[in-house]
Amino acid sequence: MQTGVSRRRFVQSAGTALAAAASFSRAGAWGRSNPTAAEVVELIKKKLAVEGVIWGPSAFDGFHLGDPNTPVIGVATTFESTFDVLKRALAAKKNFVITHESTFWDGFDPVEVMLHDPVCQAKIRFAEENHMAVWRIHDHWHRRKPDPIFAGLARKLEWTSYYSLDTRPRHYEIPEMSLEEVARHIQSKLGTRNVVVVGDPGLRVKTIGDCAHILSSVLPALRACDVALVGETPEYATFEYLRDAMALGMKKGVVMISHEALEEWGMETCAEWLKPIVPEIPVEWIPTGDPFQVPPIRG
């Protein structure tokens, strides 16, 4: 997939309109020149390099929307740059959005196949009219040690002291509790009802593997731990594997939360990490929120 080409085409298409906005508060609210989005990104790359993360090629990371030369009056970090997040960022006077996930829904943001879609057009137009830029940091953010996405989840779960950062698979060693109690703890700490459990609710749990998405990531956690905690995984693979394992007498479980609930908190960390890098610019974390709801059963 020609992701690099599509992004260049997009920036070129948006550049004409956004170039006219170069005067957009360049003096800023403080009567001084503000850095551009591209300049902020260079500061981020330098900070990452100091931490041992050298910027390299990525199919994901880079500018996805808007003009990199846009003067920045405020920065918002977020899990995913949804239309709602863009509107809230604008209302908060944050015209540079740093997102962990994609802007145009597919992981690779193939803009060229979406340019005629009305939702895509509306999103592009909104950014152009409001002089906003969106930059994605996915791969390089995960490369920090410890991975701030999973460390952020551990903090939110109040399990940081139980979290093993240096071993693989990543896992928690918790005081023993049942699988049902694990799920209820996760619901409570993340503030969401969107928790799916596969396995015996009474299963005794001491170790929980922390993993992402696909079965090949879940398997090491299941083999090494009592339970795998995963954010968004294909049901036809992970759940059915576990059902077969349970049919063979293996005492294992899976707790699934949404992709957002797994990774949101690492972008809250990103906002705090950014503040000393650009002390002259306001930085704020804007939570994306759960994409779906689970209505209660009535009857």
What are these regions (language model features)?
Residues 2-299:
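Hydrophobic structural segments
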